[in-house]
């Protein structure tokens, strides 16, 4: 049976319906249980990272290799024609799209990934993060991890902590979890880094419960998922960063009273917001979460590049 994601651009988590999300997650579970090293054997995929990345780039490229695809691309735009000669993004994408079957792209400018789709022809573009906007594949691995650990994606209590203003992962994850029934959100952030109003308005329109809090301990006993984020130094002026970086820090002692199966997630990199003593607790699940990126991204690549995927 033909799949609905074949040759589809994946720019925002809103490009995926609830059924699409379930399809990706089911495919990820199958690939985790049964690797397919030749599934993309004759495909060439561009890995175009105009912004620094460790986990996302390596996870995507590992996913490509483990499915048998050939990988071309760059991890620093400074050494490309765009960086050195002033070539436009439109021209860069127009050329790259003639070489490959799909483009995975990260860019510091919000909206850059959507712009790329206007110049990629029939070649699908997968957004690996555009500024503070969207990071849909991080959301897919987050959903996969939540489903694995909690056994469901509905009727969950989810707390999000830290930089909720610039943290694109929490924007995408909230929008995705809002597609499922009965979820409740707790947002814990300084006023300067509060969740954007458009996200809160979206939750209100859907009748989804949410609340604002000033400390992690206010909600610890209530939540199934505690999603920590770092304060993004690169998106703040130095004085603002100094004021807020240490405001929300999770320590092992803070986990007293947490639900037995509560999991602490983090998109990484971690700086100071989770102390290392948390790593030794059964609640810490951020490294397993990062590992799940392989399977979530494999699933998305497999679906986007196969019209009839049977695993």
From Swiss-Prot:
GO terms for cellular component: cytosol. Keywords: Pyrimidine biosynthesis, Transferase. It catalyses: carbamoyl phosphate + L-aspartate = N-carbamoyl-L-aspartate + phosphate + H(+). Its EC number is 2.1.3.2. It comes from the Bacteria. One of its GO terms (molecular function) is aspartate carbamoyltransferase activity. Pathway: Pyrimidine metabolism; UMP biosynthesis via de novo pathway; (S)-dihydroorotate from bicarbonate: step 2/3. Coiled coil: none annotated. Carbamoyl phosphate binds at residues 55-56, 106, 135, 138, 268-269. Heterododecamer (2C3:3R2) of six catalytic PyrB chains organized as two trimers (C3), and six regulatory PyrI chains organized as three dimers (R2). Catalyzes the condensation of carbamoyl phosphate and aspartate to form carbamoyl aspartate and inorganic phosphate, the committed step in the de novo pyrimidine nucleotide biosynthesis pathway. This is Aspartate carbamoyltransferase catalytic subunit.
């Amino acid at each position: 049976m033909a799949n609905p994601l074949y040759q589809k651009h994946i720019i925002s988590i809103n490009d995926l319906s609830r059924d699409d999300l379930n399809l990706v997650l089911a495919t990820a579970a199958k690939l985790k249980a049964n690797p397919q090293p030749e599934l993309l054997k004759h495909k060439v995929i561009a890995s175009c990272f105009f912004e620094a990345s460790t986990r996302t780039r390596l996870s995507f490229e590992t996913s490509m290799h483990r499915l048998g695809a050939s990988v071309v691309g760059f991890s620093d735009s400074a050494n490309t024609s765009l960086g050195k000669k002033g070539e436009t993004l439109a021209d860069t994408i127009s050329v790259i799209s003639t070489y490959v079957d799909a483009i995975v792209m990260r860019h510091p400018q919000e909206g850059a990934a959507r712009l790329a789709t206007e110049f990629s022809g029939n070649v699908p573009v997968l957004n690996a993060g555009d500024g503070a906007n969207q990071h849909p594949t991080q959301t897919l691995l987050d959903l996969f991890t939540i489903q694995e650990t909690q056994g469901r994606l509905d009727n969950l209590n989810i707390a999000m902590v830290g930089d909720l203003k610039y943290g694109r992962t929490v924007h995408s994850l909230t929008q995705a979890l809002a597609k499922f029934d009965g979820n409740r959100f707790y947002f814990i952030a300084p006023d300067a880094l509060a969740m954007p109003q458009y996200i809160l308005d979206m939750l209100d329109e859907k009748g989804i419960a949410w609340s604002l809090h000033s400390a992690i301990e206010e909600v610890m006993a209530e939540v199934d998922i505690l999603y920590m984020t770092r304060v993004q130094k690169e998106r703040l002026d130095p004085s603002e960063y100094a004021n807020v970086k240490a405001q929300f820090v999770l320590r092992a002692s803070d986990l007293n009273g947490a639900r037995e199966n509560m999991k602490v997630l983090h998109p990484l990199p971690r700086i100071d917001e989770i102390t290392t003593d948390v790593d030794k607790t059964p609640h810490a699940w951020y490294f397993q979460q990062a590992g799940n990126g392989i399977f979530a991204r494999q699933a998305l690549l497999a679906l986007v590049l196969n019209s009839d995927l049977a695993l």
